[in-house]
């Protein structure tokens, strides 16, 4: 016994030195107590004679079972810490010679002890697990019987085996055929509450007269160990082959697919657990099948258990959907926003290695934030490593950061769950210390309501964005309410404005519930025809027309027309120079002159003659005189914007709304020729008008032109409103150079816009002029009927699922239709050139053909002219092909345009 203790003490001393080389100091007495505890809880361990990671993990499982059964007061405080330290030594025994020597000597001691335990069962009955009598003990059987084995000897650890030894059953099993692992599991069932209860009780003890135990042959320990070693080597080969196939299959997979282990192959998935949570490896397969199965592609590190109960860990890639969502949240709301932190915490709940954390942060954050996170993470790991060193668990800085000997992913995969928890705490703590960049509310102020977006959907987007920034929508409810009004479209703002301070966000939604696309369309048309923007139209809609007099406070007149205090004026105003004739000092409404001081005729007075002082020279809002007047004004009445302006300002005399579908339109200016002598005019558009979407076409005004100067303008993209008096063009006067060229016409006169030479020709043939259009993507063919006011569709061609309603209108033509039906909604028409518009046709039964009326033809801008024979001959001479028209893609212009123009031309054209 002394020799056994000396070997045991020598092994403990070498183990102490091996731990000291790794920087861990332990007490010799504590190690002795620890191995005594190992013998008590794991009596099978000395008999194995081998120390490897698999058996040492079984020792850890026994510790956990013992802890769960008898409580923490029966377990030494340092038991689990020493178990972790020795586990690390076993993992690193190949790289440390001293550790290899300590492990080898321990195995030798265990093998020798296992032989002595088999032969010395009577000397140490407390440590005897199973009594095996050898041939040498045959002579002692009678003495054993005399001692009264059943009454004097202490009971064995396994009563079932003791009963089997003392029974007189002639069919006792051969000790060499005993399943030692099965007996171990059976013994564990007596104190493991996780195992299912026994259905039958063990056989009772035989209380008859003790008899001599059956003499059995002693099992050769070497042969048994060789047999177990061969089995283990075969199992290792199979496991290596199994892992190689799994690795090869994972490489063949693409995307997030991972290898699944079906139950038929013996592979059961085990999900990661929280630190401190432990599942004994001796549980039956039925209990494992009840565990929640989680897809493996969610966790970078997963663990599977094969049919033999062996646990294997695998490393999978991140789910790219999670990375994309985290990247979007960090970029849009900030790295420390509540929504971003919630995603980080959900990812951190899994087993992430230090390499996984570094990869995730580098992919999601910017370069500077990644360096900040890394510095904070390393600092947190240093603090954690110091606490681990004080606790003596051996989890150092290299393990926490994945550096040094733990830089590979394979080494990091073998970390304990507790170490994964420490890495998670350090990483998330570093993430929370990232600085806040920019304005967190910038993304919230950028949420604006679209023109056709329902107000409820807009508020939902606001609340969702606010919840991701502030953590909850209630935290920023006042801010959201303010933005719900300021970022709403003009229609919703007008509906909310009277009740803005009287209701909450729910009231806003109720007020704007009826505002839809149709309301927006009608509002835009009303604002366009009133010459205002939608916002100005809504602001001025509820204002009372007419103001109050600033003198008397009464409504109905202004201060300049107030007669309330007219008698208080001590000195009457003296009229100045007459703005009409510029010849004398009198009021303009009292002027009787027919011509001005330059001899130009003065137009007569218009409108009511109101007594009072003269209003002075008539000017427009922009400074141009007489731009809004309906009178005929000469060129001399035009003004320049500044002394350095090159052109004279031209204004519109009426309020006009232009749309892109209308094409070029001639706008009146009220200015008439002729131009000053020896000059001609060039009309150009203003830059500010071009920026607003109104295109002004250039034009030339001849010196002898006496008609009205008009402006050719077109709306480019959107609806453009030209208010009365707005400066939209300028007239530039240039010197006229006279040459000896032949003159076709002695005097231009008032011939102005309009063409008498170019026509859209519809040949009149025996065939009816038909046209094919698409109404809501359904094709219809009808006649072009310029005599029909409205478009009419046959009831037989009308789709039955399109709604129609009765009308109170009577259609008259060749026949008569009383109360015809009409489409309940506007239909979108489209031609072959993708021109489109809206139409609401009538539907009449028994109509022979569909009729395209003027309501549709006017939108298509169709012009039908009737040229005379002379014009037709001229067009044919220029290469016109009947039914095809002019152009190089049709028949082409065969000859250049001649220089001889028409002598009595009016407007455009050269034929």
Swiss-Prot record:
Keyword Transmembrane helix: no
Catalytic activity: dUTP + H2O = dUMP + diphosphate + H(+)
Record field: compositional bias (Polar residues): 113-125, 140-152
Record motif PTAP/PSAP motif, residues: 210-213
Residue ranges of the motif PPXY motif: 202-205
GO biological process: nucleotide metabolic process; proteolysis; viral translational frameshifting
Pfam families linked: dUTPase, G-patch, Gag_p10, Gag_p24, Gag_p24_C, RVP, zf-CCHC_5
Coiled coil: 216-257
Keywords: Aspartyl protease, Capsid protein, Coiled coil, DNA-binding, Hydrolase, Lipoprotein, Magnesium, Metal-binding, Myristate, Nucleotide metabolism, Protease, Repeat, Viral matrix protein, Viral nucleoprotein, Virion, Zinc, Zinc-finger
Result, substituting residue 880 to A: 90% loss of infectivity and 65% loss of RT activity
Domain Peptidase A2 per the UniProt entry, residue ranges: 780-856
E.C. code: 3.6.1.23, 3.4.23.-
Zinc finger intervals, CCHC-type: 547-564, 576-593
Keyword Cytoplasm among UniProt keywords: no
Region named Disordered: 113-178, 260-279, 592-626
Main EC class the enzyme belongs to: hydrolase
Residues in G-patch domain copies: 867-911
GO cellular component: viral nucleocapsid
Single annotated GO MF: dUTP diphosphatase activity
Function: Nucleocapsid protein p14: Nucleocapsid protein.
Protein name, entry field: Gag-Pro polyprotein
Organism this protein belongs to: Mason-Pfizer monkey virus
The organism's taxonomic lineage, starting at the top: Viruses, Riboviria, Pararnavirae, Artverviricota, Revtraviricetes
Encoding gene, per UniProt annotation: gag-pro
């Amino acid at each position: 016994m002394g020799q056994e203790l000396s070997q045991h003490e020598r092994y403990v001393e070498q183990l102490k030195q091996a731990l000291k080389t790794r920087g861990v100091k332990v007490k010799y007495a504590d190690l002795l107590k620890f191995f005594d505890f190992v013998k008590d809880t794991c009596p099978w361990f000395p008999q194995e004679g081998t120390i490897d990671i698999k058996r040492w993990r079984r020792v850890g499982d026994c510790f956990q079972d013992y802890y769960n059964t008898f409580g923490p007061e029966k377990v030494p405080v340092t038991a689990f810490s020493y178990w972790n330290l020795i586990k690390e030594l076993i993992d690193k025994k190949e790289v440390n010679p001293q550790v290899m020597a300590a492990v080898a000597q321990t195995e030798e001691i265990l093998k020798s002890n296992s032989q002595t335990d088999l032969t010395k069962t009577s000397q140490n009955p407390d440590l005897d697990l199973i009594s095996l009598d050898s041939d040498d003990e045959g002579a002692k059987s009678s003495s054993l019987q005399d001692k009264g084995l059943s009454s004097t000897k202490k009971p064995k650890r396994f009563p079932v085996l003791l009963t089997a030894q003392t029974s007189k059953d002639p069919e006792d099993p051969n000790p060499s055929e005993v399943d030692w692992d099965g007996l171990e599991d059976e013994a564990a069932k007596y104190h493991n509450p996780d195992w299912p209860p026994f259905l039958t009780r063990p056989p009772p003890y035989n209380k008859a007269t003790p008899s001599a135990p059956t003499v059995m042959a002693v099992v050769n320990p070497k042969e048994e160990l060789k047999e177990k070693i061969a089995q283990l080597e075969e199992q290792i080969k199979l496991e290596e082959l199994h892992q190689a196939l799994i690795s090869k299959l994972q490489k063949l997979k693409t995307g997030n697919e991972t290898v699944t282990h079906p139950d038929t192959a013996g592979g059961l998935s085990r999900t990661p657990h929280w630190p401190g949570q432990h599942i004994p490896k001796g549980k039956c397969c039925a209990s494992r099948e009840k565990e929640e199965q989680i897809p493996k592609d969610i966790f970078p590190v997963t663990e599977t258990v094969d049919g033999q109960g062996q646990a294997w860990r695998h490393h999978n890639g991140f789910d790219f959907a999670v990375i994309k969502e985290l990247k979007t949240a960090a970029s849009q709301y900030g790295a420390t926003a509540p929504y971003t932190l919630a995603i980080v915490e959900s990812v951190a709940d899994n087993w992430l290695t230090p390499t996984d954390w570094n990869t995730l942060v580098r992919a999601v954050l910017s370069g500077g934030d990644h360096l900040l996170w890394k510095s904070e993470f390393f600092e947190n790991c240093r603090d954690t490593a110091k606490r681990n060193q004080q606790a003596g668990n051996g989890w150092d800085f290299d393990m926490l950061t994945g550096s040094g000997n733990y830089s590979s992913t394979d080494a990091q995969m073998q970390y304990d769950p507790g170490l994964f928890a420490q890495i998670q705490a350090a990483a998330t703590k570093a993430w929370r210390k990232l600085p806040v960049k920019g304005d967190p509310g910038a993304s919230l102020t950028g949420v604006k309501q679209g023109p056709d977006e329902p107000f409820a959907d807009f508020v939902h987007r606001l609340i969702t964005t606010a919840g991701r920034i502030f953590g909850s929508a209630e935290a920023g409810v006042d801010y959201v309410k303010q933005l719900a009004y300021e970022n709403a479209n003009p229609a919703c703002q007008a509906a909310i404005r009277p009740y803005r301070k009287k209701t909450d966000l729910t009231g806003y939604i109720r007020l704007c519930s009826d505002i839809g696309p149709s309301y927006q369309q009608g509002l835009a048309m009303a604002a366009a025809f009133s010459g205002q923007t939608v916002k100005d139209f809504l602001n001025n809609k509820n204002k009372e027309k007419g103001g109050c007099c600033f003198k008397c406070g009464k409504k109905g007149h202004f201060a300049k027309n107030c007669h309330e205090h007219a008698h208080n004026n001590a000195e009457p105003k003296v009229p100045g120079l007459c703005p009409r004739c510029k010849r004398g000092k009198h009021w303009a409404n009292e002027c009787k002159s027919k011509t001005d001081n330059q001899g130009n005729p003065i137009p007569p007075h218009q409108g009511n003659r109101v007594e009072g002082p003269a209003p002075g020279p008539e000017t427009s809002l922009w400074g141009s005189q007489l731009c809004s007047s309906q009178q005929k004004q000469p060129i001399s009445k035009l003004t320049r914007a500044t002394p350095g302006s090159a052109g004279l300002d031209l204004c519109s005399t009426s309020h006009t709304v232009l749309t892109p579908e209308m094409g070029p339109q001639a706008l009146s200016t009220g200015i008439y020729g002729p131009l000053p002598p020896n000059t001609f005019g060039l009309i150009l558009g203003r830059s500010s008008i071009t920026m607003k979407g109104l295109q002004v076409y250039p034009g030339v005004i001849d010196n002898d032109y006496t008609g009205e100067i008009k402006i050719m303008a077109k709306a480019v993209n959107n609806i453009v409103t030209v208010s009365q008096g707005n400066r939209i063009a300028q007239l530039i006067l240039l010197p006229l150079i006279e040459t000896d060229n032949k003159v076709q016409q002695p005097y231009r006169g008032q011939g102005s816009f309009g063409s008498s030479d170019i026509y859209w020709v519809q040949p009149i043939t025996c065939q009816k002029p038909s046209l094919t259009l698409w109404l809501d993507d359904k094709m219809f063919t009808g006649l072009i009927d310029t005599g029909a006011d409205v478009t009419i569709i046959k009831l037989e061609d009308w789709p039955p699922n399109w709604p129609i309603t009765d009308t109170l209108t009577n259609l008259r033509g060749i026949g008569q239709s009383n109360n015809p039906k009409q489409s309940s909604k506007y239909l979108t028409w489209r031609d072959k050139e993708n021109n489109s518009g809206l139409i609401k046709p009538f539907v009449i039964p028994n109509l022979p053909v569909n009729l395209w009326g003027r309501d549709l033809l006017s939108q298509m801008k169709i012009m039908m002219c009737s040229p005379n024979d002379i014009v037709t001959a001229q067009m044919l001479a220029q290469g016109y092909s009947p039914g095809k028209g002019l152009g190089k893609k049709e028949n082409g212009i065969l000859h250049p345009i001649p220089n001889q123009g028409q002598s009595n031309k009016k407007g455009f054209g050269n034929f």
